[in-house]
């Protein structure tokens, strides 16, 4: 009995050490999303540049698209912005979600840095971000023609991320036949 009591702390230590050691090989930027394979959450939000124009989840259907969560307060969003602009110029459909931001600042940002978005919506109170499980900005979702979330990137979408992760999936979604 005394021996078991003495070995218990050692056993607990070994179990904790194994989990900590295993964690050294995990990618901290890889944050799984429970929404992969599920429809984009329902929303009805105004456009940043024209609040009378609204976008809903139904508007995301028809073509594969990127949905990019961004904010003027986000330094990493500024880093990825030129790549998003390049992709939009190549015909990639990109929607923006301006997350917890001031609308006037967002309009100024888009006017100064160019607007890569087919439409960017204002999620000023963060409700859609909460439904998406947003950890912060930038985050980018790849959705298919039916509005199903197929992939999520947490962090900057740069040329490497586009080339290695998103472009192959995007092309695959473009090549899929229409659902009947």
UniProtKB/Swiss-Prot annotation:
The lineage of its organism: Bacteria, Pseudomonadati, Pseudomonadota, Gammaproteobacteria, Pseudomonadales. Keywords: Cell inner membrane, Cell membrane, Cytochrome c-type biogenesis, Disulfide bond, Membrane, Redox-active center, Transmembrane, Transmembrane helix. The chain crosses the membrane at residues 5-25. One of its GO terms (biological process) is cytochrome complex assembly. Its main location: membrane. The keyword Transmembrane helix applies. Disulfide bonds join 74-77. SUPFAM superfamilies: Thioredoxin-like. It comes from Pseudomonas aeruginosa (strain ATCC 15692 / DSM 22644 / CIP 104116 / JCM 14847 / LMG 12228 / 1C / PRS 101 / PAO1). It is a single-pass membrane protein. Residues 34-175 form the Thioredoxin domain. Belongs to the thioredoxin family. DsbE subfamily. Involved in disulfide bond formation. Catalyzes a late, reductive step in the assembly of periplasmic c-type cytochromes, probably the reduction of disulfide bonds of the apocytochrome c to allow covalent linkage with the heme. Possible subunit of a heme lyase. It holds the Pfam family Redoxin. InterPro entries: Periplasmic_diS_OxRdtase_DsbE, Redoxin, Thioredoxin-like_sf, Thioredoxin_CS, Thioredoxin_domain, Thioredoxin_ResA/DsbE_sf. GO terms for cellular component: outer membrane-bounded periplasmic space; plasma membrane. One of its GO terms (molecular function) is disulfide oxidoreductase activity. It is found in: Cell inner membrane. Residues 26-180 are periplasmic. This is Thiol:disulfide interchange protein DsbE. Residues 1-4 are cytoplasmic. The keyword Transmembrane applies.
């Amino acid at each position: 009995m005394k021996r078991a009591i003495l070995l218990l702390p050692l056993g607990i230590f070994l179990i904790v050490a194994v989990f900590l050691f295993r964690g050294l090989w995990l990618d901290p930027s890889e944050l799984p999303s429970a929404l992969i394979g599920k429809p984009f959450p329902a929303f009805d939000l105004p456009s940043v540049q024209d609040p009378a124009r609204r976008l809903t989840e139904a508007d995301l259907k028809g073509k594969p698209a990127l949905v990019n969560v961004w904010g003027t307060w986000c330094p990493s969003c500024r880093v990825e912005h030129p790549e998003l602009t390049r992709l939009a110029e190549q015909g990639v459909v990109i929607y923006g979600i301006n997350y917890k931001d001031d609308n006037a600042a967002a309009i100024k940002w888009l006017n100064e840095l160019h607007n890569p978005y087919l439409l960017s919506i204002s999620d000023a109170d963060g409700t859609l971000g909460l439904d998406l499980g947003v950890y912060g900005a930038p985050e980018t979702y790849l959705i298919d023609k039916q509005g199903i979330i197929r992939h999520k990137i947490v962090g900057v979408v740069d040329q490497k991320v586009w080339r290695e992760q998103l472009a192959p999936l995007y092309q695959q979604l473009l090549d899929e036949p229409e659902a009947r």
